[in-house]
Amino acid sequence: MFGNPAMTGLHQFTMWEHYFTGSIYLVLGCVVFSLCGMCIIFLARQSPKPRRKYAILIHVLITAMAVNGGDPAHASSSIVGRWLYGSVGCQLMGFWGFFGGMSHIWMLFAFAMERYMAVCHREFYQQMPSVYYSIIVGLMYTFGTFWATMPLLGWASYGLEVHGTSCTINYSVSDESYQSYVFFLAIFSFIFPMVSGWYAISKAWSGLSAIPDAEKEKDKDILSEEQLTALAGAFILISLISWSGFGYVAIYSALTHGGAQLSHLRGHVPPIMSKTGCALFPLLIFLLTARSLPKSDTKKP
């Protein structure tokens, strides 16, 4: 058997199961980086009004790539069946995973709030200085950095996951430090941004009906206000589902002290869910933009 010898999971993966999960991480990483990269280039080449209309959406895609940034280390370690990059590498992967994940969730919150401003406070949004976007984006990354740094400073800690092929918050040590970290993070960096973001989107969606058709036509771009608002809502719903696996493992471990007894399968499902959710974002954008692109004339002479 392979995995973390310090863990006593109910089921430990065989060599072939590690090969299979390593291949999944490798494919997911390639798919997310390829699709998000193409989507970022596509959006960056547009000339919308206001000019920074797609700025936060682009950073949503950048943070989706960051969530998958550890896939090469995760995939190679899974294929071998053990962590390959030592204790320093473990701390770096834990930090990067939390930085990417928390920044991604907060960037979704910023995208939802931008949709609310774009629909419900149109005049201010149209004249909003570019520096506001820089401040908002920087603040979202600051929140991600804060939560990723705390385990390095002693509020909880990073360690090997139950399958022993990647590192994240050490849920096998459910002490008071871990419990307080998990509960504060769940409330202030998951429940709050997701619920607040959904409320903002619901207000924006209601406000769309008040925009005159002439204004909608004038503001029409590769992605309309309706499409962007629908994207923001879909992104939050996808994230609520795709990050629920990590939420379950973290809360379960905090309440039951059973993190060390998780099976290898239950240890792999949360990261696969979150990474798969990130792959859906650029697909939805391409689907909507494909419907907005002008159709070529295919009539025969």
Curated annotation (Swiss-Prot):
| Ranges per topology, Extracellular | 1-17, 77-94, 154-180, 256-264
Organ and tissue specificity:
Mainly stored in myeloid bodies of the inner segments.
Per UniProt, subcellular location reads as: Membrane
Q: Which SUPFAM superfamilies does this entry report, sorted A to Z? A: Family A G protein-coupled receptor-like
Task: Tell me any Pfam family this protein matches.
Answer: 7tm_1
Q: Which GO terms describe its cellular component?
A: membrane
Cite the GO molecular-function annotations of the record.
G protein-coupled receptor activity; photoreceptor activity
**Which residues in this protein are found as N6-(retinylidene)lysine?**
K275
Q: Which residues lie on this side of the membrane: Cytoplasmic?
A: 44-54, 121-132, 209-230, 290-301
Listed A to Z, the keywords are: Chromophore, G-protein coupled receptor, Glycoprotein, Membrane, Photoreceptor protein, Receptor, Retinal protein, Sensory transduction, Transducer, Transmembrane, Transmembrane helix, Vision
Q: Which residues are glycosylated?
A: N170
Q: Which family does it belong to?
A: Belongs to the G-protein coupled receptor 1 family. Opsin subfamily.
Protein purpose: Retinochrome is capable of acting as an effective catalyst in the light to convert various isomers of retinal into 11-cis, the form that is required by opsin to resynthesize rhodopsin.
> What's the name of the protein?
Retinochrome
Q: Which organism is it from?
A: Todarodes pacificus
